[in-house]
A protein has these predicted regions:
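Alpha/beta-hydrolase superfamily serine-hydrolase fold, recognizing
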Residues: 1-275
Length: 275
């Protein structure tokens, strides 16, 4: 019997050797995207300094274009919209406006605040994106990890009108209770109330939304089990839901690939954008 403690399956750094290299790559690629893709930076959707979004545009005329929101992950406590600008490459190449959303981070704020922020970001898009050449009637969403969790909050039972046509949920967290026993207990201390209120596995959802639940083949077991449970949960509610296992991908390489043309993840994203 080994004397070494088991690795926490939620602590991604312990399971992805190239974690730091991938983070450095996506940050570098994001700066390239910001330099090369037409954009409007730091558009405010609220009064707080954290309540901003970046809009990226395809080349050419902007007239009632599809719109896609992306919500970044980081266990609600790290990263920013700037780190994920590269996702806009796939979205704009598919002919849509990319909206990369920022939000406040735990533990400085609690989860209720973050959920409220992303919902208000969606409402800003509904009310204002037409002024930027977008069609709010063609709105889709994606998110990775904690961002996938937050993306579900844009079409759950509390968020009416829904207005989301399709969603891509990548490496998502849909039952928050296991996280209370993970390394995150010392970092963000998810409360019993937060786990109860904000676990998507306990929510109802808009049955008109098409959802792809994706997970990397090399992710740790909880991400696979949560994907399976949430797929079944949505299916029982009548949503059109598919589940994709990304071959050879881990929690970090899968999100990196969202902005790399020709990868399975980027193809899934482009398909959702075109829904």
């Amino acid at each position: 019997m080994s004397g070494h403690p088991a690795k926490d399956p939620f602590r991604i750094r312990d399971h992805v050797v190239e974690f730091d290299d991938i983070v450095a790559e996506i940050v570098r690629r994001s700066e390239e995207t910001r330099a090369n893709v037409p954009m409007v930076a730091d558009v405010a959707y609220g009064a707080d300094a954290t309540e901003t979004m970046d809009l990226f545009f395809p080349e050419g005329k902007r007239d009632r274009l599809p719109v896609h929101m992306f919500i970044h992950g980081g266990y609600w406590r790290m990263f920013s919209k700037r780190d994920y600008s590269y996702v806009a490459e796939t979205v704009t190449n598919a002919g849509a406006i990319a909206v990369i959303v920022d939000y406040a981070l735990m533990p400085t704020v609690r989860m209720a605040r973050i959920v409220d922020q992303v919902r208000r970001a969606k409402r800003w898009v509904f009310d204002n994106v037409a002024h930027h050449g977008g069609n709010p009637g063609l709105l889709t969403v994606s998110g990775h990890s904690a961002g996938a969790h937050l993306a579900t909050m844009l079409f759950d039972g509390d968020e009416r009108p829904f207005g989301i046509k399709a969603a891509l949920l990548l490496g998502g967290l849909y039952d928050l209770k296991p996280l209370q026993m993970s390394f995150l207990a010392a970092e963000i201390a998810i409360t019993d109330e937060e786990a109860r209120r904000f676990s998507p596995i306990d929510h109802s959802f808009d049955p008109s939304v098409g959802v792809d639940i994706s997970v990397g083949a090399d992710e740790t077991p909880p991400f696979h089990s949560q994907a399976a449970l949430f797929t079944d949960h949505l299916d029982t509610q009548g949503l059109t839901v598919s589940r994709t296992t990304l071959g050879g991908a881990n929690h970090m390489s899968s999100v990196r690939d969202l902005g790399l043309a020709g990868t399975e993840a980027a193809s899934l994203l482009a398909r959702v954008v075109a829904a």
